[in-house]
Each structure stands twice: as structure tokens, then as C-alpha cells.
Amino acid sequence: MIKQAISDICISMKAADYLTLPDMLVNNVPVALDAAAAKAYSQLETELLLQVDEDMITAGSAGVLTGKLLQLCNGAIYSENKTAVKVHDCKIDAFLELIEQLHGQHALVFYNFQHDRDRLVEALAKYDLRVRVYSQAKDEQDWNNGEIDILLAHPASCGYGLNLQRGGHHAIWFGLTWSLEQYEQANKRLHRQGQEHPVIIHHLIVQGGMDEQVVEALENKGDMQNALMDALRVRISKLRS
């Protein structure tokens, strides 16, 4: 191996070893479902999970089921004909409250599903804010030039190589992801060389919902595939106990 052959004359270093970066702080924002939303979530969870054989859970089936529960946490869910059906605005309301608390500071907002993006755009249209959905290199330039107040992005579309550190230092996870790599790389768009402020990562977490299991798995930084299946088994056991 080349690495072994030159180990006596070379030192392998990670960026964290030689770059001085500001702190990265996490702000977990609890989101309480109203009575109607909580009932809808409970009913869907029961319908989905009681059909599952715990011994037959695979990563694929777990991903589909938890994906539906994460959609419901966010406030809408796709029907069988791929139409988004709105269920509640609890997380949207919590998001807008957080935006107001930032007092004009710019925010990079990560969504998970297309209906998340559409509902966020609709909700933000009522405010005097410059909102953009990331889609091209010009969005990166405009963000860093301070010309965008709220930049919406899917974590898969803004991973490696994107530099957003000059446009803001707040990242809001409206929709959470089971992908640790996507999560870490998305956060690094702000937390990188050239960032002058502590980076604050805001998680919007529905209390009692699948959001809580995702955040726990991300914080533990373990095997996300096993964490996903374990989270599903735990919720099935609770329903059947």
C-alpha cells in the first residue's frame, strides 16, 4: 500500500486537524402536534406497522414505512396516485416561528420530500423575504453575496463541493434524513473554511414521532441502516404491547 510505504515521511491529516473552524451548535426544536394531527399520525402508524412481521423487516421495507411516517411528521403525505395530501401545519408553523426568531438572519433550509418544498415556498410567500430553491450555480453565488434570505435545498443536491459559508450560518432541518453522509455533508456547506460565525443546526422534531428516532440515530453516528430497522421494531413492539 502506498500509504504504508510513505508513512515514515508523510502525515495524513483531516481538515479538522489543521483548519480552525467556528463552533457548530445544535438546536433541537420540539414540535407538538395538535389533537387532530396527533390522531392522524397515530392512526396511520397503527395501520402501517401492525401489518408488518417484525422478523421479516428489511432495510427496504423499513425505509418505505418510516418514510411515510416522516412525511406525516412534516405535515403531508403522498397518496397512492402520488398526490400530496396535507394533514397538518404544525411543523410549518414551528418553522415560521423559528424564522421570525432569527430576526432577518439568513437560513439554509433542508427539506426531504417535494411536498415539503412546495408547502414551504407557499408559506414563505406571505413574508417579505427573498426565497430561492437551490437548483444551479447562480444560487450559490447569490446566496454568498447576501441576495437570498431563505435558501431551500434537498441535502442530496448540495453535498460535496458546494460552498455556502459566506451567505449565512443557520441551517434548518425541516425534513430529516436517515442518511448520515447526506446529513453531515449538508451541514458542512456552512461549517467550512471561511465561515466567520458559529454555525447553528436547527432540527424541527415532532414529539412522539419518527423524527425523534432519526435525530437519535444521527447523533449516535452509528449504522443508520440498522438504526432504521431497530426504530421500526421498537415502534411495532410498543403498538403490540
Can you annotate each of these PLM segments?
Residues 36, 115-116, 138, 159, ...:
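Short alpha-helical
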Residues 163-176, 200-203:
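A short beta-strand element within the Helicase C-terminal
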Residues 106-110, 115-160:
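Conserved helicase ATPase core of P-loop NTP-dependent helicases/translocases
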Residues 110, 153-154, 173-175, 204-205:
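Conserved beta-strand segments of the P-loop GTPase G domain that flank and frequently precede/overlap
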Residues 99, 108-112, 123, 142-143, ...:
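A generic "structured core" feature
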Residues 40, 116-120, 160-163, 182, ...:
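Phosphate- and divalent-cation-binding pockets in alpha/beta enzyme and binding domains
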